[in-house]
Amino acid sequence: MPLYEGLGSGGEKTAVVIDLGEAFTKCGFAGETGPRCIIPSVIKKAGMPKPIRVVQYNINTEELYSYLKEFIHILYFRHLLVNPRDRRVVVIESVLCPSHFRETLTRVLFKYFEVPSVLLAPSHLMALLTLGINSAMVLDCGYRESLVLPIYEGIPVLNCWGALPLGGKALHKELETQLLEQCTVDTGAAKEQSLPSVMGSIPEGILEDIKVRTCFVSDLKRGLNIQAAKFNIDGNTERPSPPPNVDYPLDGEKILHVLGSIRDSVVEILFEQDNEEKSVATLILDSLMQCPIDTRKQLAENLVVIGGTSMLPGFLHRLLAEIRYLVEKPKYKKTLATKTFRIHTPPAKANCVAWLGGAIFGALQDILGSRSVSKDYYNQTGRIPDWCSLNNPPLEMMFDVGKNQPPLMKRAFSTEK
């Protein structure tokens, strides 16, 4: 945070930017190059054996309200150390975020923390601000799912999105299954004990750590051989030689022997095609086929990949190889005229790209004031704009009273001839 921030911004303090992910939350201030904190999106309750995830879509509203209230209190008063009444808020959200969740979140911010204004910004659109481009095919590989959404001339093409339940959660489930089936543990009492006899289930934090420290994505040729050996359709396919085994310490006394075959096979579930021939790579191609034909070439040459799962070693190289391999198949070859695919390299780690875009947008204070939902408007109506709602109020009603609109906004809303 700048030492003299009040002098250069007309007295208005920089906005708070929150990227509320299902696994981790990124939080910081607009105009900065990185978040102040990246913390698990969980809270701990007395008497509960496990931490409670804050981002849940299948619980009642009042329970969700209490979780969000406690979690955001931690963000403001343990990590950011600022008064929430003094600063606008930019919330990075998914376009598929359920309405009841975003309404509960804004109710917490306006009614409990009394923030001046809130802007709900799509994560896919914010990612493009870090690159200075206005058209791209954006793939977000997160914890629960992988979601692809084309952005053309700054407008999300909402009828061309695609999603699959392939992300960090699926990797953790597959990793736990293989570890419990194949791996052994050395303890102080005995050697080479089966893992289920020592611990019935593996905590999520340990699975995350094993995945990050030991797992990687193989190249296309090796990956196809691993998949062929796994399914063994013809009965004579041999698996490529595995990487070295890794000894992973568990709570200081136990040593878990992670097999090399697990290290490179776990991530293959992202690229294995299911019964409907769907994978992370086909998500991009299928979305591209739904786009207007005159936009496909530009979108194919501007791929942007964000999300923590995409940070696995070798992921981007494999994704590009998979796309180039699949585009030669009859399903796509006759429809997609382009064969050129390029992936951008954003100026931040993949898990922080959307947050950085929100920090850039939040630093434009005139634009931020004209696009945010003000506290006065929310207190009068109790509503927030929603792209999937047909009865949104006029845009002029949502902005701060007395706030001068920038020239582009004046032209957009002007009724003068």
UniProtKB/Swiss-Prot annotation:
Ranges in coiled-coil conformation: none
Gene Ontology BP, a term: retrograde axonal transport of mitochondrion
Record keyword Cytoplasm present: yes
Domain of life assignment:
Eukaryota
A GO CC term attached to the entry: axon cytoplasm
How is the subunit organization of this protein annotated in UniProt?
A: Subunit of dynactin, a multiprotein complex part of a tripartite complex with dynein and a adapter, such as BICDL1, BICD2 or HOOK3. The dynactin complex is built around ACTR1A/ACTB filament and consists of an actin-related filament composed of a shoulder domain, a pointed end and a barbed end. Its length is defined by its flexible shoulder domain. The soulder is composed of 2 DCTN1 subunits, 4 DCTN2 and 2 DCTN3. The 4 DCNT2 (via N-terminus) bind the ACTR1A filament and act as molecular rulers to determine the length. The pointed end is important for binding dynein-dynactin cargo adapters.
Q: What does this protein do?
A: Part of the dynactin complex that activates the molecular motor dynein for ultra-processive transport along microtubules.
Similarity annotation: Belongs to the actin family.
The molecule here is called: Actin-related protein 10
Q: Give the source species.
A: Bos taurus
State the taxonomy lineage. Answer: Eukaryota, Metazoa, Chordata, Craniata, Vertebrata
Gene it is expressed from: ACTR10
